Structure formats: C-alpha cells, structure tokens
C-alpha cells in the first residue's frame, strides 16, 4: 500500500435483513479503516425476502451516522475480485462460531491465492449477538409476541421496516 493511500475495506453479505450483528461489525470495521464499503452480494441461487433496493435502503439507514461508510452491490463475482475492483486492501469477515472460523479460514486461503495483496480481517462479535443471523430474525416473525422479540436483534430502522411490512398481519 502506498503512503497516503486510504485504507479501504469491504464487508459483504446478503443483509436480508441487516441485524444488530451486522451493525456491530460495521461499527467496528469503520473505526479500523479510512473507508468501509458494505456490499450486498447477490447470490442468484438464494431466495431473498427483501429486494436488493430494500436491503440497500436499510443499510443506508443504519450506517448514515458513519461518514466513512458507503453501500454497494455486486453480483456474479468472487468477493475478492470485487474488493480488487474497488481498490480495497482488506476484506472484513465475522466469526460467530468454530464452523464459521473453519469456513472463513479456507476462504481466506483461496482469496489469498486469487489476490495476495488483499488481506482478510476476522472480527468476533460479543457473545450476546454472536448467534444473531438474518435467517434467525426472519424465523421469529409471525408467532404471538414476535414484534417484541425481533426488536432485540435488529436496528430500529430495520425493525420499523419489518413492522410496516407485516402490519396487516397484526
């Protein structure tokens, strides 16, 4: 990295929807780098609950307090190739469990083979949000008391979006 070159990182995921775990990762990563790109990776084989535009809007809402964070979308590319395209020197990944670690460690080696100039940074969220996932949040919607329950796991702007979407069911 050249002197005076901004330290740019990419934090990618499906963010369907963004959770407090994602927000924790964003908060930590933005404090470590000059610029953080929060990128929605489009997986055509994965059925999403929210459109790409909705997910990007939610991410913009929950990251607006961080001037060094921007959102983006990438599709049909390896994350490491996307990182290279946006001149990021780092990929940020979250480790919630031993199985996450094993998977991410393997991916880090593959990424290093494809783009040795890009480093992977692993962050471990605190125990109280380590098990929070978008899939878990979506699974909690519906039963009696779900609105109070999911409020514990998603940022306020995301909570309001989910409530508005399901208001006809209450």
Curated annotation (Swiss-Prot):
UniProt-listed GO biological process terms: coenzyme A biosynthetic process
Sequence positions that bind ATP: 14-15, 22, 94-96, 104, 129-135
E.C. designation(s): 2.7.7.3
Pathway assigned in UniProt: Cofactor biosynthesis; coenzyme A biosynthesis; CoA from (R)-pantothenate: step 4/5
Subcellular location: Cytoplasm
GO function terms (MF aspect): ATP binding; pantetheine-phosphate adenylyltransferase activity
Cellular component aspect of the GO annotation: cytoplasm
Any single Pfam family the record assigns to this protein: CTP_transf_like
Signal peptide interval: none
Alphabetic keyword roster: ATP-binding, Coenzyme A biosynthesis, Cytoplasm, Magnesium, Nucleotide-binding, Nucleotidyltransferase, Transferase
Site residues, Transition state stabilizer: 22
Catalytic activity: (R)-4'-phosphopantetheine + ATP + H(+) = 3'-dephospho-CoA + diphosphate
Annotated residues for binding of substrate: 14, 46, 79, 93
Cofactor(s) listed in the protein's UniProt record: Mg(2+)
InterPro entries assigned to the protein according to its UniProt record, in alphabetical order: Cyt_trans-like, PPAT, Rossmann-like_a/b/a_fold
HAMAP family, sorted: PPAT_bact
Record-linked NCBIfam families: coaD_prev_kdtB (TIGR01510), cyt_tran_rel (TIGR00125)
Quaternary structure (record): Homohexamer.
Function: Reversibly transfers an adenylyl group from ATP to 4'-phosphopantetheine, yielding dephospho-CoA (dPCoA) and pyrophosphate.
Similarity remark: Belongs to the bacterial CoaD family.
Protein name in the entry: Phosphopantetheine adenylyltransferase
């Amino acid at each position: 990295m050249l002197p005076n070159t901004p330290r740019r990182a990419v934090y990618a995921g499906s963010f369907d929807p963004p959770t407090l775990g994602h927000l924790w990762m964003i908060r930590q990563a933005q404090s470590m780098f000059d610029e953080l790109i929060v990128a929605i990776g489009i997986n055509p084989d994965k059925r999403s609950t929210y459109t790409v535009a909705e997910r990007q809007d939610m991410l913009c809402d929950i990251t607006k307090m961080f001037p060094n964070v921007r959102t983006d979308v990438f599709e049909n590319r390896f994350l490491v190739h996307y990182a290279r395209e946006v001149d990021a020197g780092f990929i940020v990944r979250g480790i919630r469990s031993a199985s996450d670690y094993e998977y991410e460690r393997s991916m880090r080696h593959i990424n290093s083979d494809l783009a040795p100039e890009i480093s992977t940074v692993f962050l471990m969220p605190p125990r109280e949000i380590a098990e929070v996932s978008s899939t878990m949040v979506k699974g909690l919607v519906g039963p009696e008391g779900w609105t109070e329950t999911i409020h514990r796991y998603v940022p306020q702007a995301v909570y309001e979006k989910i409530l508005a979407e399901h208001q006809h069911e209450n």
